[in-house]
Amino acid sequence: MATVVDLVCGMDVDTEMDPASSVYRGQTYYFCAPGCKVAFDEDPERYLRGEQDTGTLVPQEPVTTLPVDVAIKTRRSVARMKPDPVPREAIERMLEAAVWAPNHHLTEPWHFIVLTGSAKRRFAELRRDLRRTLFKNPDAPEIQPALKKIYADTLSMPVIIAVTTTAPDDPDLRDDDYGATMAAIQNILLVATSLGLGTYLRTGALIHYAPLLEFLGVPAGRRIAGVIYVGYPDHIPNRRRTPSINKTTWLD
């Protein structure tokens, strides 16, 4: 495997994974995402001087430097985090960005529950317990390593944020508030990326698990929209997306 450094964001790039690339003055440069290539192409001399949009090492002090389009295209679902603590200021900046998401009639339907310490341990137990319910014989010896791994992997996340929203009977209002809350979650993910943090958004059966709702104190009339893991990335996967032209219909 040949690994080089993305001059824009400082992340490692595996050149054998067919990453985005640009040729400048006869030299080929590789990038972890198309957004980094776009930024480089706009001002290559800046990045050749070493003026990265984020440090080669993940910054321990949060500094927002990534342009919005670069943050969007370099955001990844990061499953492996470093144990380094995440500054409270970083979490607060992410949540402050979240509340500026568009929401119909200014309902501001979101609420954020930040888990650390013993609360995070209890969350890890509940996620393990949920997985147990999926096995016909959850006490079987061969199942135990998988359950232990789920617990350990969840506990290894430095910060966990549960995002709740309203669950009104009116289907129109329900859709409006859910859409607004997911936009708020996207704001969280993008600001985290701009701060050098990794995130992983979980939904599925977890957000409907009654013991978790009870633990988090989610009242009747509300539901969990998603759970976000936050930390400094230990590994950032390369990803591709289908070009928008293949997903777009223009009507005139």
Which positions does each model-derived feature cover?
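Short Cys/His-rich "knuckle" micro-motifs
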Residues: 16-19, 44
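N-terminal amphipathic, basic helical "cap/leader" segment at the start of enzyme domains
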Residues: 53-156, 252
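C-terminal helix-cap and adjacent tail motif
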Residues: 60-64, 71, 224-252
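Cys/His-enriched microdomains
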Residues: 4, 27-30
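Short linker/helix segments within small regulatory modules
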Residues: 19-28
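Cys/His-rich metal-chelating microdomains
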Residues: 12, 34-35, 39
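Small-aliphatic-rich amphipathic alpha-helix that forms the alpha element of a beta-alpha
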Residues: 75, 98, 161, 167-215
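Short cysteine-rich clusters marking metal-coordination/redox-active sites
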Residues: 6-9
